[in-house]
Amino acid sequence: MNKKYSYGLFDVGNSAYLIVTLSFIFAPYFAREIVGDVQLGSAYWQWTSGAVGILVALTAPFIGSYADHVANGRIKVLIVSTVLTVLINALFWFSQARDSFIVYTLLIFFLSSYFFEISNASYNSLLRDSSNKKDEIGRTSGLGYALGYIGIVPFLLFILLFIIKTDQPILDLQKENFEHIRFIAILVSFWFFIFAIPMMTFFWKGKKSKKKKYTSIKDIKKIIWNNKLTTTGKFLIARIFYADAVIVMQTGGGVYAVGVHGFTPKELIFILIVGNLVAGVFTYIGGYLNDKFNSKMIIMWSIAALILSVFAIVSSPSKEFFFFSLLLVAAAIGPLQSASRTLMSRISPQNTQGKSFGLYALSSKATAFVGPLMAGTITYFVSQQAGFASISILFLVSLFMLSKLELNDKN
């Protein structure tokens, strides 16, 4: 299989965890059925997401450095972290709809989310290796995200038709004790693992990388600070703010839809299907625009669109208006993620991709507790609308910082 497509298929797999577990299915189930209070459950979920961010920030750069140092380290880290993600995620099956399972569910969320982030950092570090040419990095990144968004649609349709919408889910799963919702976690793990196999086997059987001299903390520091703040350092600082805001959107979007507008699981699946199709198309187009123009421009336009979407969401008077607001999010968030990954790969030397994407993960997690904790706390004391609206501040700060970022022609 072409390495570019094996790379893209991994995105098909991990999208199931990101979309179904983190946001639109299991997060609302936790808040509404396990906690029994959507507002309080939303706060718990956001706080746990923030705690994951702290741990990723403390460990990802060093794991990335290890991956650069050890022979075939990046693919080894990818395999281990991916397997741990799918195994731990399957344990959501035991999260029954009782408040006695609050701590258990949050622990599973914490561990699976942590290993997912490490897996994702390793995956991103292999972007350049997955591209046939350096001037095709944007297209490879865009293809990956596009396949992830569109490829997950059959999975969502299966969940909708055979588990959620039907009166008698497959395998005689009982709706009364939410077995049908909990079983989705097992399906997510299976889906993720199956689509991760092509990439894991391709790189494992491919050209072997050699063991390198160990990288010190000083060498990691030089990537972002070399007598002055480097271009990479400036970009990562700007990314800290918009990545925080995106985390809130991803982990809190489903809970917000349930708490404010009363969306049902069936309606959430429908939103996901349409939104993913929109995101897939715009992300694929964005990948070509990355190579034709520049990633910074794509990032800034995407952030501007997300700012508009935040205000549209919190002012939505109806489910219908909220639905179309989410389509704007879908059209912007994919190109933003793809362009960010592309820019990071281009401004980082080939032999530092592991540690560079470890820092990339750090930039989305170093203050990742700020966005979720800010949104969660404002949600707890004020309202879900106010908590969600607060992320526009983070988007605006990042937009200002990116406007000051200077890139050379090569980047």
For each predicted feature, which ranges?
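Juxtamembrane intracellular "pre-TM" segments in multi-pass secondary transporters
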Residues: 1-5, 204-237
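Multi-pass alpha-helical transporter architecture, strongest
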Residues: 4, 93-95, 191-202, 389-411
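Short amphipathic helix-loop junctions that connect adjacent transmembrane helices
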Residues: 21-42, 251-268
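Helix-to-loop junctions at the C-terminal end of transmembrane segments
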Residues: 58-72, 282-294, 379
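A membrane-interface helix-boundary motif in multi-pass transporters
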Residues: 74, 163-190, 377-395
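Structural signature of the two symmetry-related core transmembrane helices
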Residues: 76-91, 297-312
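Helix-loop junctions at membrane interfaces in 12-TM secondary transporters
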Residues: 93-107, 314-326
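Intracellular juxtamembrane helix-capping segments at the cytosolic ends
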Residues: 117-131, 335-348
